[in-house]
């Protein structure tokens, strides 16, 4: 029968296979060539499990602990076949079915105050319909293993909600205790908790079974019979979530809007109906506490509730096959965990301290099929439970493959944060995919954008590091180019000269002309050998000389004859014939005959005194050294030439710049000289006692400081020459002053009308440059003191009382201001600064508006406020100044130009 059942699925069509899986409560994806074998295998397993459950009947469940087969008292024998059928059909047991919580040692004693908490209650009599808890068959990244995820668990359907189970700071649902309350007695002995671990929390509300629900765990027997033969790596899970250390999931209504990708939008309508049903059930799920401590491995703390078992009781075996199927976005899951912690419509998770426990590094064998999805709602679990999760798809029971894990006691504020910082690897087919962060307990919970950014960088860290950056690419290209040119140069240096072929023969096509045509062949061969020997000897000697290892470059005729005689007596007789052929040939054959002088012409062999090679034979390193020296020498010469050109250009540029600067200074000096002469002429008109001319040295000394006179001598001479040649208003005369003759300048006064129209008088206000507003004037007066800039040019001022004209101009401009009590002119200021003190800030503000932005003597006047203490520190005499200052006369000379210009404008407009 089993064989028939095994072969039957192979003959099913795609539609029949889909309907069969739907009949078992599964929701498969599209049937393709890659998914069909997996679906057939799953259907075969479901049928075998169904047959085994029918054979087992009401027998107690068996365990599959490969380490120790000590069997705890079966607590689900009375659960009946309904639960077994529900487990086989993929239906999760109701939260009220708590028969699996009973252990022989009094484990998990349940308060009797809840009449509906046992099987005898109303909830134990009804069976959950199979259609109420479909599971969705999905695939891992390579579609090689099947993952099943309860659709009604997340409330969103598809991968949107399957992905949220693993990283929400929660643990997957627990395995039924009927299947997992078996542990190795030795392991229980080793995992005996410390004395302070046994602290109990007050008992929580008693468990109540919602009406219409019935629990059953009899499917464990069928699994127990064939569990030893099953390969954990090839066993496909039926459920996608499982508790690690007995965590309790937060109600799923908080997660129904979670979306991990945009590929599962078509399942939202179907999954929303599951959400409504699941929400109605989650409202009635009570929480309970154990009255006896469990071993550390089975410690379950819902937000810090410590649940441990006695030493004699079994440990809680945990299965996490497909602990979080399809979880694709870690950061989204952590955001859901944060939402669950805040309790927005969800059960509040207790955050009491989690005790320190230790997990032995022993891998447990697969025990039972995965627990049903709503089982965890009746168990208290710690969101800070930090056991590792085995994410192998066919991994079977919970296994701890890494060395021992320790969990420190967490404060209440860090209990949930610790669980949210747990990282689980999603690689379903790697040898070891357990990740555990060292700073799990101490890492603070980050905000959602920070956590999402952190997870993105985490993904980048595990990505392959074989990317070739642009920096290394540039270095590689540069190195390749350098190597190319280096090899090219070395190849060039290693090449032979063009005069000698590669096999060493002389580069003479026909060494014997018509003159030697009658020579016998044997003599020709002997003569050629003689020339070869001489050529090699002379080339070696010349090469040694060029490389510096020998001081001799040439070989005398006697030495050459002795060398040939040492080689053989036959070469001695042919030596003269060879020399004659070299002289008669007239071509460069690599051997040169030299007489007593280097430029001596040779016509007979008797005149030949020395033999010299024209092609020195040098070693590779000698050639390289000579080439390096030659190239370096030429580069130095080139650089020297470039430097010389740059120096010449720089000097020319410097000369041009200096000439331009001297020309500009000359024109500035001319302007200053003209201003001095004009001002002196105006002063002479007012004061008839003054001479109408000025000595040229006196003008020079008034315009140029003593320390600059030597440097400015050339500029002054050019300015004097320019005035003599180009300025008609200045006349040069010779006058006797103080008994000595001096060259003087006299200003020739133009006509009065032209002066009034064209000539701008000195020390007068010439109008406003811009209007004052909030952008260039503060709305309130800050201090009673002002600092006025650009009122004068100290270089242009002549005499000792010129500062009085500046003070008079300020008082005339502010004639309507009766609050000015002190004016100080800084004669040495290059900015032409004048300081004014008023009686109050209001008077200072009035003066600010009158002076700021005005033209005075061709300069733009600017004003700013100055602190009173700094003003008194600079001018201590102003402390006692309280009398308002007034202009010395009523003519308002500094304002006359404004009246004149206004009058001219009006007259021109009327005409």
From Swiss-Prot:
Cellular compartment(s): Nucleus inner membrane
Organism field: Homo sapiens (Human)
SUPFAM superfamilies: LEM domain, RNA-binding domain, RBD
Keyword terms: Acetylation, Disease variant, DNA-binding, Membrane, Nucleus, Phosphoprotein, Transmembrane, Transmembrane helix
GO cellular component: membrane; nuclear inner membrane; nuclear membrane
Subunit structure: Interacts with SMAD1, SMAD2, SMAD3 and SMAD5. Binds to both phosphorylated and unphosphorylated R-SMADS.
Biased composition (Polar residues): 879-896
Spans through the membrane: 475-495, 628-648
Domain LEM: 6-50
Regions of compositional bias (Acidic residues) in chain numbering: 217-236, 259-269
Modified residues (Phosphothreonine): 209, 365, 883
Cited function: Can function as a specific repressor of TGF-beta, activin, and BMP signaling through its interaction with the R-SMAD proteins. Antagonizes TGF-beta-induced cell proliferation arrest.
GO function term, MF aspect, one: DNA binding
Principal cellular location given in the protein's record: nucleus
Entry protein name: Inner nuclear membrane protein Man1
Pfam families: LEM, MSC
DNA-binding residue intervals: 707-726
Record keyword Acetylation present: yes
Tissue localization of expression: Heart, brain, placenta, lung, liver and skeletal muscle.
Gene3D superfamilies cross-referenced by the UniProt entry: 1.10.720.40, 3.30.70.330, MAN1, winged-helix domain
Lineage, highest ranks first: Eukaryota, Metazoa, Chordata, Craniata, Vertebrata
Gene: LEMD3
An individual GO BP term: negative regulation of BMP signaling pathway
UniProt xrefs under PROSITE patterns: LEM
Modified residues (Phosphoserine): 27, 140-141, 144, 185, 187, 259, 261, 280, 352, 402, 777, 911
């Amino acid at each position: 029968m089993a064989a028939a059942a095994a072969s039957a699925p192979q003959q099913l069509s795609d539609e029949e296979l889909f309907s069969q899986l739907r009949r078992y409560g599964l929701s498969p994806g599209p049937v393709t060539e890659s998914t069909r074998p997996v679906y057939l295998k799953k259907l075969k397993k479901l049928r075998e499990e169904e047959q085994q459950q029918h054979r087992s009947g009401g027998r107690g469940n068996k365990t599959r602990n490969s380490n120790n087969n000590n069997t705890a008292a079966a607590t689900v024998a009375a659960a009946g076949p309904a639960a077994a059928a529900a487990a086989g059909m993929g239906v999760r047991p109701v939260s009220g079915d708590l028969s699996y919580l009973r252990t022989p040692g009094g484990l998990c004693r349940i308060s009797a105050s809840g009449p509906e908490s046992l099987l005898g209650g109303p909830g134990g009599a009804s069976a959950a319909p199979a259609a109420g808890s479909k599971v969705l068959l999905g695939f891992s990244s390579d579609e090689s293993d099947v993952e099943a995820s309860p659709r009604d668990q997340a409330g969103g359907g598809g991968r949107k909600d399957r992905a949220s189970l693993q990283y929400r700071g929660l643990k997957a649902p627990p395995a039924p205790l009927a299947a997992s309350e078996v542990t190795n007695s030795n392991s229980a002995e080793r995992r005996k908790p410390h004395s302070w671990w046994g602290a109990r929390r007050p008992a929580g509300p008693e468990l109540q079974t919602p009406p219409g629900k019935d629990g059953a765990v009899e499917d464990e027997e069928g699994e127990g019979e064939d569990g030893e033969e099953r390969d954990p790596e090839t066993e496909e899970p039926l459920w996608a979530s499982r508790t690690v250390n007995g965590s309790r999931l937060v109600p799923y209504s908080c997660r129904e809007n979670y979306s991990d990708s945009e590929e599962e939008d078509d399942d939202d309508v179907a999954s929303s109906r599951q959400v409504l049903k699941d929400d109605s059930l989650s409202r009635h799920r009570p929480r309970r506490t154990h009255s006896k401590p469990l071993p550390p491995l089975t410690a379950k703390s819902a937000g810090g509730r410590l649940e441990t078992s006695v030493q004699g009781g079994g440990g809680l075996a945990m299965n996490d096959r497909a602990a979080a199927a399809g979880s694709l976005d870690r950061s989204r899951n952590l955001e859901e965990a944060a939402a669950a912690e805040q309790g927005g419509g969800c059960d509040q998770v207790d955050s009491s301290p989690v005790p320190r426990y230790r997990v032995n590094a022993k891998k447990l064998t697969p025990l039972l099929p995965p627990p049903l999805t709503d089982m965890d709602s009746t168990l208290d679990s710690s969101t800070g439970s930090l056991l590792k999760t085995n994410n192998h798809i066919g991994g079977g029971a919970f296994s701890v493959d890494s060395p021992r894990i320790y969990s420190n006691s967490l404060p209440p504020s860090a209990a949930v944060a610790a669980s949210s910082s747990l990282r689980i690897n999603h690689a379903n087919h790697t040898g070891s995919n357990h990740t555990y962060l060292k700073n799990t307990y101490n890492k603070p919970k980050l905000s959602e954008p920070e956590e999402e950014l952190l997870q993105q960088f985490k993904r980048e860290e595990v990505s392959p590091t074989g990317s070739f950056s642009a920096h290394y690419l540039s270095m590689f290209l540069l190195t390749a180019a350098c190597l190319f040119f280096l090899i090219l140069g070395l190849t060039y240096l290693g090449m032979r000269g063009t005069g000698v072929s590669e096999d060493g023969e002389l580069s003479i096509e026909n060494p014997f002309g018509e003159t030697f045509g009658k020579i016998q062949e044997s003599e020709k061969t002997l003569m050629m050998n003689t020339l070869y020997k001489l050529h090699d000897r002379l080339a070696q000697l010349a090469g040694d000389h060029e490389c510096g290892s020998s001081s001799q470059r040439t070989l005398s005729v006697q030495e050459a004859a002795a060398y040939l005689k040492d080689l053989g007596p036959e070469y001695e007789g042919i030596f003269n014939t060879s020399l004659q052929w070299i002289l008669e040939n007239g071509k460069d054959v690599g051997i040169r005959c030299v007489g007593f002088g280097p430029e001596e012409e040779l016509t007979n062999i008797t005149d030949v005194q020395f033999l010299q090679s024209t092609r020195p034979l040098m070693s590779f390193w000698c050639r390289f050294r000579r080439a390096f020296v030659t190239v370096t020498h030429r580069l130095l010469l080139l650089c020297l030439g470039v430097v010389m050109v740059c120096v010449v250009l720089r000097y020319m540029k410097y000369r041009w710049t200096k000439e331009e600067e001297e020309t500009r200074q000359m024109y500035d000096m001319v302007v200053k000289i003209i201003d001095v002469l004009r001002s002196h002429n105006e002063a002479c008109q007012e004061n008839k006692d003054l001479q109408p001319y000025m000595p040229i040295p006196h003008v020079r000394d008034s315009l140029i400081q003593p320390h600059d006179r030597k440097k400015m001598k050339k500029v002054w001479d050019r300015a004097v020459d320019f005035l003599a040649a180009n300025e008609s208003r200045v006349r040069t005369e010779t006058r006797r002053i103080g008994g000595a003759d001096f060259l003087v300048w006299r200003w020739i006064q133009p006509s009065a009308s032209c002066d009034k129209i064209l000539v701008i008088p000195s020390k007068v206000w010439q109008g406003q440059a811009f209007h004052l507003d909030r952008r260039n004037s503060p709305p309130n007066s800050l201090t009673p003191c002002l600092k006025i800039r650009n009122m004068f040019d100290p270089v242009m001022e002549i005499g000792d009382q010129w500062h009085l004209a500046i003070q008079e101009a300020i008082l005339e401009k502010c004639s309507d201001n009766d609050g000015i009590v002190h004016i100080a002119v800084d004669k040495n200021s290059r900015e032409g600064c004048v300081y004014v003190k008023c009686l109050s800030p209001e008077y200072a503000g009035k003066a600010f508006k009158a002076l700021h932005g005005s033209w005075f003597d061709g300069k733009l006047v600017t004003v700013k406020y100055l602190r009173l203490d700094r003003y008194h520190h600079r001018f201590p005499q102003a402390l006692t100044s309280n009398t308002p200052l007034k202009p010395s006369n009523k003519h308002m000379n500094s304002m006359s130009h404004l009246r004149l210009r206004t009058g001219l404008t009006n007259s021109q407009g009327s005409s």
